[in-house]
Amino acid sequence: MDEIQIASILKSSELFPIPQGVKLSYGTAGFRGDAKLLESTVYRVGILSALRSLKLGSATVGLMITASHNKVSDNGIKVSDPSGFMLSQEWEPFADQIANASSPEELVSLIRKFMEKEEIAIGENNKGAEVWLGRDTRPSGESLLRAGEIGVGSILGSVAIDIGILTTPQLHWMVRAKNKGLKATENDYFENLSTSFRCLIDLIPSSGNDKLEISKLLVDGANGVGGQKIEKLRGSLSNLDVEIRNTGRDGGVLNEGVGADFVQKEKVLPVGFGFKDVGMRCASLDGDADRLVYFYIPSDSSEKVELLDGDKILSLFALFIKEQLNALEDDEERKQSRLGVVQTAYANGASTDYLKHLGLDVVFAKTGVKHLHEKAAEFDIGIYFEANGHGTILFSESFLSWLVSKQKDLTAKGQGGSEEHKAVSRLMAVSNLINQAVGDALSGVLLVEVILQHLGWSIEKWNELYKDLPSRQIKVEVPDRTAVVTTSEETEALRPMGIQDAINSEIKKYSRGRAFIRPSGTEDVVRVYAEASTQEDADSLANSVAQLVKSFLGSS
């Protein structure tokens, strides 16, 4: 790193002094916190993103300014790798180091050492970095984006491009498309969604001459960017009657009593929904539209809702994909293709039982989207979801190539109208509709809606796939959370010695009992999850396991 480059970083970093007493950590959600404290962090992540682009041959990297389902006064920053997925975990320690560097001189020193280790060069013979920056609708987003731009620009030869107000999944999709050499504007994103949705609608089997009556879908936009974007998309969608509430244009506050996180956790109606909506099909997006849950109001005598969470969405997707695969001829390549679903230990046991009953390969991953994504990528078709509504479907390049050849082969044989050809076409359309970079509430809504139309199901019928087992979660404060070590799937405790045997003894006392413990990633607590055939038993099992944690670790 030459003197001109060092001077550039020293000069720009003086604009963004680091706040005192704040320690930040880059997690699954990137950096998050009070927006007033984040300018220096976003500036420094701008530097990191430019270095990441240079490391990967000047591929386009994305920066998203959002705090997802957090309150409106918060904000955050996360990086999209050129693949459209999250920042490589190998770079997360460097993100932590530079975000917490106490002075411009320490920042330069850390950057210099990292560039030497990663063999990153800046100079005339190297093409500059390219970083695309997007933000959600938070008032703090504009000034934070400018800090990110200055950070990118402090690495000589780098270009920062502001691509506007977007959902998080839009930014990831656009970065992925750009690096694959495809059209990558927001309009291209919408065109891709509407075209693949229409294709799937056209492939819905007709039952005689009867047309399926399509009821209206009510969407809770969380007063965020997702509601505004689905408004924009609605005009190009036939076969979908959508009413959007909580768009943020009518004075509602982002994520306050609205949104997927609120509905999933509280299991009550979001603001703007009431007894007039009894029996209606409702969907709720989160603040940056990367999570999706469905719900309906079963009667006008309660504010409680029937929730269809990420587990139910995963089950619907898996059922549909399995149906299409079953329609394909069992040639050698089809037999070898693997469909798998990935869940976390927090997935309701009833959903896991249902998926296994379908004959699917069910695997568990550590909590956190990045861990599920990696596991899902091991399959030809991998479907992953967390109960909170974050998830997607991944198709391997080799399986997509096989689908293309299969479609051509069937057409050449004059079997273009066969059920097998339709199944191949549906799978290809799903691979285009679904956002294979990250979970995307907009593409998720469209896929749920087209599958329900395909099956001729109401939301109540969908909800009957299985009945959730009652569950309970408890946090236990402990002196040292690191004393608990679990398996990689977090389903069993390896340490302290003997605690898992004690947990197993408690589980055996309850019908359909299941329980596990895991240390929190951010605070000195151990999280307890328990489920059983009745709520009373789930509560009792959770309390018993919490007592075991206290007796093995002590309580703080």
Swiss-Prot record:
Q: Which family does it belong to?
A: Belongs to the phosphohexose mutase family.
The entry's active site is S68
Q: Tell me which residues bind Mg(2+).
A: S68, D286, D288, D290
Any GO BP: carbohydrate metabolic process
What does the record give as cofactor?
Mg(2+)
Q: Which reaction does it catalyse?
A: N-acetyl-alpha-D-glucosamine 1-phosphate = N-acetyl-D-glucosamine 6-phosphate
Question: What GO cellular component is one of the record's annotations?
Answer: plasmodesma
Name its pathway.
Answer: Nucleotide-sugar biosynthesis; UDP-N-acetyl-alpha-D-glucosamine biosynthesis; N-acetyl-alpha-D-glucosamine 1-phosphate from alpha-D-glucosamine 6-phosphate (route I): step 2/2
Function of the protein = Interconverts GlcNAc-6-P and GlcNAc-1-P.
A GO molecular function annotation here is: metal ion binding
Q: What class of enzyme is it?
A: isomerase
Output the SUPFAM superfamilies linked to this UniProt entry.
Phosphoglucomutase, C-terminal domain (SSF55957), Phosphoglucomutase, first 3 domains (SSF53738)
Q: Which UniProt keywords apply?
A: DNA damage, DNA repair, Isomerase, Magnesium, Metal-binding, Phosphoprotein
Enumerate the residues binding substrate. Answer: E386, A387, N388, R518, P519, S520, G521, T522, R527
Cofactor, how bound (note) = Binds 1 Mg(2+) ion per subunit.
Residues modified as Phosphoserine: S68
Record keyword Endoplasmic reticulum present:
no
Q: What is its EC number?
A: 5.4.2.3
Keyword Methyltransferase included in the entry's annotation: no
Query: InterPro entries, from UniProt?
Result: A-D-PHexomutase_a/b/a-I, A-D-PHexomutase_a/b/a-I/II/III, A-D-PHexomutase_C, A-D-PHexomutase_C_sf, AMG1_II, AMG1_III, PAGM
The name of this protein is Phosphoacetylglucosamine mutase
